[in-house]
Amino acid sequence: MDIISAMQKRKSTRAYLAKEVSRRDIEEILSCAVLAPSAINLQPWEFIVTYGDEKERLVRRLLKARLERQVKCGPGTDNPLPERISLRAKEAMAIMEPHISAPGQTFNQFIEEGSCSFYGAPVAIIVVIDKLFPAIRYLDVGLAVSYLLLAAHAKGLATCPIGLIAAYNDDISQMLNISEEKEILLGISLGYADENSPANAFRTRRADLKEIITWYE
C-alpha cells in the first residue's frame, strides 16, 4: 500500500475483533513509528505496550477511575473555541451519534467508557515523553504517532488515538511502573477492525482546503 492511499483510507476505529495481534506485527509497526523525524534527532518518544491479561487489568483500573472521577471528553481548552472550530466537532458528533447510540448510553458515555477500555482492542499502547522536554517536543511525538497509525493501517490493522486517558496519568503510571519523570501524552488502541460494527460505519469530514490554507504568490 502506498503512503497516499494509507492516508486517504485510514480512520479511527472504535470496535475491534477478539483477534490477537502478533508481537512481531507490533514490533514492525513501532519500528516504522521511530523512523519519524525529530529535532536534532532527540527521538523524545517512548511506547509502553500492553496486551493480554495486563491490558485487561489496565482497562479495569481505568474504568474504575472513570466512575470515581467522571472525567469528561472535550477539547481541553481554557477558553471557548472559535465557532468555525467548534462547528467541526459538532458536525462530527452529529455524524457519529446515530451509529454509536444505544439504549441508556449517551454519546459522551460511549466515548468516555470506550476510551478507558481502548474500545475493546486487544492491544493498548501508552505514549509517554520525559517531562524535561518542553512542550514543543510534543510535535516530534505526534509525528511518530502518525507514522505508527499509518504503518498499522498498511499492515491491515486498525487504530484509534485516545487522549482522554492522559487524565488518568497517576493510575496508569502506578500500575505500569512509569517513572514520575515521564508524562503520559495519549493512548492508542490497536487491533483488527470489526467491520460489521455500526461504530465503524461512518467517516468524519475534513475541512475544505480553502478554510485552512493561505497562499502567497
Language-model segment annotations:
Residues A6-T13, E83-K90, L185-E217:
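C-terminal helix-cap and adjacent tail motif
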Residues E28-V34, V123-M175:
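Small-aliphatic-rich amphipathic alpha-helix that forms the alpha element of a beta-alpha
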Residues A39-L42, C116-Y119, L176-E180:
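Solvent-exposed alpha-helices and their adjacent loops that cap or buttress functional pockets
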Residues I40-Y51:
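Short loop-to-beta-strand entry elements in the cores of soluble alpha/beta enzymes
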Residues P44-W45, A121-A124, L185:
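Short, surface-exposed beta-edge/turn micro-motifs
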Residues V49-P134:
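Glycine/small-residue-rich phosphate/adenosyl-binding loop
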Residues S173-E180, N200-F202:
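Short proline/glycine-enriched turn/loop segments at secondary-structure junctions
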